[in-house]
A protein has these predicted regions:
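Secreted, disulfide-rich extracellular signaling modules
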Residues: 1-227
Length: 227
């Protein structure tokens, strides 16, 4: 849906005339649009452990737990970390099939709300975006090494400031420290085709991703000094 028009007809001072008014909505004007999906519809999908889902609007995002500590133990430094999310083909025989989310934002779970509230752009440290590859039927993030390093260094800095506490203490205080969300988005571009804003995808899209409780592969290239 690109545009919705609302026509309002009313009488003014008992004269039967036609008046026109506009209800303006923009980022600067408070909007009260609300999309809601019944919980009883989403719950079985959320509880499905064989895969994960992406549904828009007001549907389901995918949460990913990154093996930060295990990856940092691979070497002295991570040069690259590539992660791919493959989607299942829709084999259902429906009269109308939903579209596939075309742009997918990866953002730290703890920063997701602030990302949209502050109209932030991806920084390739705590947030990334990619587009759907229809040839290979997947979403690919070519290098999230800076995200892995950032999460690890943030935790290590906390330990340095609180040497008396443990990993369990940190994870209890910051349970989402190693988690990211995959969020379908749409982009706004300027006249030079630069992205100037990310918005929640409000089109009718749905897809299933390979994963669920099973681990997916992250391809890591690391380096270490000979000792």
């Amino acid at each position: 849906i690109d545009q919705v028009a609302l026509n309002v007809y009313f009488r003014n001072a008992r004269t039967d005339s036609v008046y026109v008014t506009q209800f303006v909505g923009s980022e600067e004007v408070l909007q009260t649009n609300r999309f809601e999906t019944k919980k009883e519809t989403l719950t079985p999908l959320v509880n499905d452990t064989t895969c994960t889902y992406l549904k828009t609007p007001a549907g389901i995002f995918t949460e990913v737990t990154l093996p930060v500590e295990a990856m940092m133990e691979e070497g002295d430094s991570i040069n690259s970390a590539k992660i791919t999310f493959t989607r299942y083909n829709d084999t259902g025989n429906y009269w109308h099939k939903f579209g596939v989310p075309q742009t997918l934002l990866m953002v730290r779970k703890s920063e997701m709300s602030n990302f949209f509230d502050k109209n932030k752009l991806t920084d390739n440290i705590t947030s990334y975006y990619t587009t759907y590859n229809s040839t290979f039927n997947r979403y690919e993030y070519s290098n999230i090494a800076r995200l892995i390093i950032h999460c690890y260094n943030e935790r290590e800095a906390w330990f340095a400031a609180h040497p008396e506490l443990t990993i369990e203490d940190y994870e209890n205080m910051y349970p989402d420290w190693d988690k990211v969300m995959l969020v379908p988005v749409s982009t706004v571009r300027d006249s030079k085709n630069n992205i100037v804003n990310f918005r929640h995808d409000l089109s009718l899209n749905s897809t299933r991703l390979v994963g669920g409780i099973d681990q997916i592969e992250i391809k890591v290239i690391s380096s270490a000094f000979n000792k």
